């Protein structure tokens, strides 16, 4: 059976994403992100499902430091709607709760709701671990923020669904593989391309490196800087663009990037997820 690795405990949102994209695969829980990526690098799993950013809490900082250190490829993206649930032990009421435990990202996404209810926030390793710990300790004054899948797995009650501060909360995942998956350009499809590059720390270096995307009409949808090598110079970048390298405009833009930048590495080109085809991305 094929295997997909994810960070977290069974019932985590990464696990939920795995059940959506790879329902018939074995889902391998890992303690951390590098563990999930290493399973793929070493051939113990075919894929890794890794969260990159959330529409409410922003980017997952650690991932940008890890991606350049692997030799893995991005073969797909997945957008998972986040329905945070406030969980409690069976028979517990909201009035009994004093503290709520969850992953820091989940706490940030439900921050205002908990302030309004006067609940103290406590960080946990991940959302599902907070649910599992709640089930094991049996404290009726403690709640957890996790998925409905976690509630089902650990026998907890759902006191509130959609507990997040902002509706439409969504997490973007990237699917990593040890082998590149070259998908020839199909004019009937829309594509994303993800890549890494570096520039010298001099005036206009980034401007020149990215100029080709503007002159060739290629839309850049994400540009993130990250530190590397123990320096404080943010001259390393992760870039997502609309398009496929087999398209002339994209090919020309990448050629200009390679001229002005260094260490250009295309992580992968993959079909655009249907979430991007909604009105918000048109």
Predicted regions and their residues:
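Domain-level signature for soluble enzymes in the chorismate/prephenate branch of the shikimate pathway
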Residues: 1-282
């Amino acid at each position: 059976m094929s295997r997909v690795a994810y960070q977290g405990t069974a019932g985590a949102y990464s696990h939920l994403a795995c059940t959506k994209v790879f329902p018939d695969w074995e889902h391998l829980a890992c303690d951390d992100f590098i563990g999930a990526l290493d399973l793929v690098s070493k051939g113990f799993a075919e894929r890794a499902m890794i969260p990159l950013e959330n529409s409410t809490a922003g980017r997952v900082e650690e991932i940008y430091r890890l991606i350049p250190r692997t030799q893995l490829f991005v073969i797909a993206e997945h957008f998972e709607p986040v329905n945070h649930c406030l969980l409690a032990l069976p028979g517990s009421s909201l009035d009994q709760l004093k503290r709520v435990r969850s992953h820091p990202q989940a706490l940030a996404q439900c921050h205002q709701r908990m302030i309004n209810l006067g609940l103290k926030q406590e960080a946990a390793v991940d959302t599902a671990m907070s649910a599992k710990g709640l089930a094991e300790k049996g404290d009726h004054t403690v709640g957890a923020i996790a998925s409905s899948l976690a509630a089902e797995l650990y026998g907890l009650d759902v006191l509130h669904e959609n507990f997040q501060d902002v509706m439409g909360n969504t997490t973007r995942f990237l699917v990593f593989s040890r082998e590149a998956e070259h998908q020839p350009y199909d004019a009937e499809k829309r594509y994303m391309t993800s890549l890494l590059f570096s520039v010298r720390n001099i005036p206009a270096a980034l401007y020149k490196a990215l100029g080709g995307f503007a002159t060739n009409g290629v839309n850049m949808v994400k540009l993130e800087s990250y530190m590397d090598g123990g320096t404080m110079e943010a001259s390393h970048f992760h870039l997502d663009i609309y398009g496929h390298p087999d398209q002339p405009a994209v090919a020309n833009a990448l050629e200009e990037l390679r001229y002005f930048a260094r260490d250009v590495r295309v992580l992968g080109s993959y079909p655009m997820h249907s979430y991007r085809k909604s009105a918000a991305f048109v």
